[in-house]
Structure formats: structure tokens, C-alpha cells
Amino acid sequence: MPHLAYPTTTCEGFRCETHCAVRGLAICGELGPADHEEFERLAQHVRYGPKEALFSEDEVADSVYSLIEGIARLYKLLPDGRRQIIGFALPGDFLGMAPGNRYSFSADSIGGVTVCKFFRGPFLRFIENRPQMLLRMNDFATRELSLAQDQMLLLGRRSAEEKVAAFLVGWRDRLARLEGVTKTVSLPMGRQDIADFLGLTIETVSRTFTKLEREKLIVIVPDGVRVLDPKRFDALAAA
């Protein structure tokens, strides 16, 4: 997918204390006031428009990102040019900590995101003598591994219905950390994004949504889906 130009928009006047709704979930959530003030001085608060790239696969991994607003799409390009989406990042998620000196996947904005962007060197120097930050990093890495394992199961021998249901339940549970439990599952990503995440065609995903609605498990609403029978739906997702 082609990207628009890298942004030049910084969030003038942004202050974590008054503007960040996900500070408790973010990488800085365990810092005391003095450490947090120093940490914020390292940050650039940047706004990316729809489809703008935060970073691209194989670029030098010189920055890390704490997502504070919006949804980011994480993906790799296969040798034949096809796209495999490997995840969707939510507010509070931490991105860009590559195992080597280059990013191993790409990240772009779905509908506009705001991030705290840190140059990698100063960030690593800041956390190295702060055990609470190292523990926080470990928590993020553990969660990322769990999500990767969940996707491996999704790409396994499941029917299209089971894959779509499992995706919706997993996404609903992630949203619940931000918004609380609700029967309506907001879907800012399109059907093609869901298809590229599940290893299905967009036609199969669209037919599956229609079938789930016809079976009265969900109803399709403008911003996502509403689960009509949570017990049956969760059972299908767990199959």
C-alpha cells in the first residue's frame, strides 16, 4: 500500500497530564511526577493523517512510538506484493522497538493517529536505570507475543465464520480495556483490512458478515457490529 508523505504536524501545546486519556495504559504509566516530566521532554507529540506511515519495514529503526489516539495498522509485504496485516494498535500501545536496527514491519494510520514519538537512543538511555520502565516494556512484549499467538490460531484450520467471530471477540476484548464492556464492536478498519489480517478474501469476509447477521448472531451497524447473542457468538469464536 502506498503511503502519503511523512507528517510535519506536531501537536503544539500538548501536555500528557491534561491531554492524554490513556496515560495509565501507556509506556509511561508507572512513572512518578519528576520522571514523567523528564520523559515528556524527550517526546515529540505528532499527528498523522489517514494512511500516513509512522514507519516502514526495513527502514532504520531510529524512533519508538506510544500511540495515544486513533488506530494504527501493522503489516508486512510478502515477496509477491500481497499485504499481510499482523495487527492493529490501539491507544496505549507501544510501537517500533525492533529487535535489530531496522523495523521488521510497517505501521500506518487508519483514520488519523496521535503519538508520542521518541528517538530510540535517548529513550533507551532513559529506561535503562528505571526498573519500572523495564517491567513495563516486558509487559508490552508479553502482550505482543500473546496477540501474535492468537493470530497464528486465527490463520489455522478454522472456518471463515470461526475466524471472523474470533477476530471480533478478540477486538471487542481489547476495546473493553479502553471503553468498557459493550455489545457494539467498533470497526474502524475496513473489510479488506480484516481480510488481510485473517488470510481471507474480501468477498469471503463480506459474505461471512452477512451470514452471521442472517443467523442473528450480529447486526451490522454504521460504525461496526452489534453482538445479539454473546453466548453463542463467544462459543463460535472459541471453536
Curated annotation (Swiss-Prot):
Keywords of the record: Activator, DNA-binding, Transcription, Transcription regulation
GO CC annotation, single: cytosol
GO molecular function terms noted in the UniProt entry: DNA binding; DNA-binding transcription factor activity
Keyword Transcription regulation: yes
Residue ranges of the annotated DNA-binding region, renumbered to this chain: 191-210
Binding site for a nucleoside 3',5'-cyclic phosphate: 27-149
One of the Pfam families matching this protein, by short name: Crp
All residue ranges annotated as the HTH crp-type domain in the record: 158-231
Note: Possesses 4 cysteines which may bind a metal ion (possibly iron).
Role, per record: Transcriptional activator of anaerobic gene expression. For aromatic acid degradation. Also required for the anaerobic degradation of benzoate.
Protein name: Transcriptional activatory protein AadR
Native organism: Rhodopseudomonas palustris (strain ATCC BAA-98 / CGA009)
